């Protein structure tokens, strides 16, 4: 799949942008804060309804944007996508609420999502455009907290499988409700004698949803091992592959892929932890507490790898994610690579540029200049110079 046209209005530093895109490699280059990363952010937002860098959606609306006829300012993003199964238009509008509405506790923004001009839920948008985003901050996937690695798996699987994204949303709500009950018992706001009866329903909901998420994550990790490992070898020029191991908080299911068996193990573990969970006021096991162990030659790369190894590992995982999407869906995702070559030595830069040589894969790369790219890459890339929220053919 590929994006043929991107239209932005009052998004970040873009007052207006209409950009035609093609399959293959596109290079956006220019000084920092010119708007290169914003183009990638916009495409990612249209694919997932989430920004990879904004703390709140209201930050996406251009600061100087003015409302019309009493309508508060808004950002509008539209893209046209060609997929293996046809054409689709995606649109997201983020509108600031009027000050008086925000003052009474309403959310600061209203988000409207449309597919082919028909209003839909945000969840329904996910998967219509599949993207893989790599940014310098993504090194946290290797070096950061477990939440970073869980998010990596969730974003990948949510774009592949509509059931996964819906189950994940349901699971998160169940965890919130269950934690609310556990805190109430811990604080003495509910009688403990009813705890088992009240938790029975939520335990079943948690185990059913959690079992599906766990099964799909375990399958994905097996596939990613086979895909990302060789990519790391090619990128690093060595023969020691990257390896992944899923670490579940539910004892004994790290390699079990039968949903019913996972569900039963989940329920049994919840029963054993009942007193501990009430004492701490939170759900102690489940997909929201799991981790993904990343190693090279059996050594955890987050703790002991060099910066170059960590960055190569992160990029290998992202490119492995793209391959997994292609295999599972029959359609290649759009690759969004921000500041791709920074912190890589000359050898790794060369390997990365060779790996990206796929004319049927839309790849959009950003950089501050062109000096780090080889002539072969620059010759086949469509180049745009970005300055102060404007794009110029180069």
From Swiss-Prot:
Q: Which residues of the sequence carry a binding annotation for ATP? A: 30-37
Keywords from UniProt, A to Z, are: ATP-binding, Cytoplasm, DNA damage, DNA repair, DNA replication, DNA-binding, Nucleotide-binding, SOS response
What is one process in the GO biological process aspect for this record?
SOS response
Q: Report whether Nucleotide-binding shows up as a keyword of the record.
A: yes
GO terms (molecular function) for this protein are: ATP binding; single-stranded DNA binding
Q: Which family does it belong to?
A: Belongs to the RecF family.
- What name does the UniProt record give this protein? DNA replication and repair protein RecF
Q: What is the lineage of its organism?
A: Bacteria, Bacillati, Chloroflexota, Chloroflexia, Chloroflexales
